[in-house]
A protein has these predicted regions:
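N-terminal active-site beta-alpha-beta segment that forms phosphate/nucleotide-binding
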Residues: 2-123
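Conserved phosphate- and dinucleotide-binding cores of soluble alpha/beta proteins
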Residues: 4, 91-189
């Protein structure tokens, strides 16, 4: 099979997987999401104990709410960063408890670059990576823009990439492409 046909086949499979997993996500009610999110936040707090640099994410409705973990790290004086989309890639910026986040064109809360410090990917110790789906061996199905893949390629080998998902987002297998960057660890409810 030619490379172009293979890429087309993989992309088609990813579209199908995204639809199937999004359908599963719609079965979670608010209480189930909150309980699962609390479990995930507690696991993250237990995992990341040392004062570290952490790239988190601002959860959207279909993602686990990790805000309690973020608040814990902020109060414990960790260097907490959030991603901001700039063109076709993301940059990490520091945030603090008093920061006013701004809404991106996609409705995601991002740091205001005018009152935040840009942090290089090589300065991050832990990266919390959202996704539509994950396999147990770390393959990640994102939203299709490649933003996280591009960012993760720039990190140091010792940076721990942690996939964050509800347990119903875990899939058995998935084909990937060369540019797809896996996570090192998966945290679910």
């Amino acid at each position: 099979m030619s490379d172009a046909l293979n890429r087309s086949s993989i992309n088609s499979e990813k579209v199908t997987l995204r639809k199937a997993i999004n359908k599963r996500l719609r079965t979670l009610d608010a209480v189930q999401k909150q309980n699962a999110s609390t479990t995930i936040s507690n696991k993250l707090i237990k995992l990341i104990k040392d004062n570290s640099s952490i790239l988190c994410f601002s959860p959207i409705q279909s993602e686990p709410n990790i805000r309690p973990a973020i608040q814990h790290w902020l109060k414990s004086n960790f260097r907490v960063c959030l991603p901001k989309v700039e063109g076709d890639h993301i940059q990490s910026y520091t945030v603090n408890e008093n920061d006013n986040l701004i809404s991106s064109s996609m409705g995601i809360l991002e740091p205001n670059p005018f009152n935040s410090i840009k942090i290089s990917p090589v300065e991050i110790d832990f990266i919390l990576v959202p996704g539509i789906g994950f396999t147990r061996d770390g393959k990640r199905l994102g939203r299709g823009g490649g933003f996280y893949d591009k960012y993760l390629e720039k990190t140091l080998p010792q940076t721990l990439k942690i996939g964050i998902a509800f347990s119903l987002q875990i899939i058995d297998t998935m084909r990937t492409e060369n540019h797809d960057v896996p996570v090192d660890l998966l945290i679910t409810d």
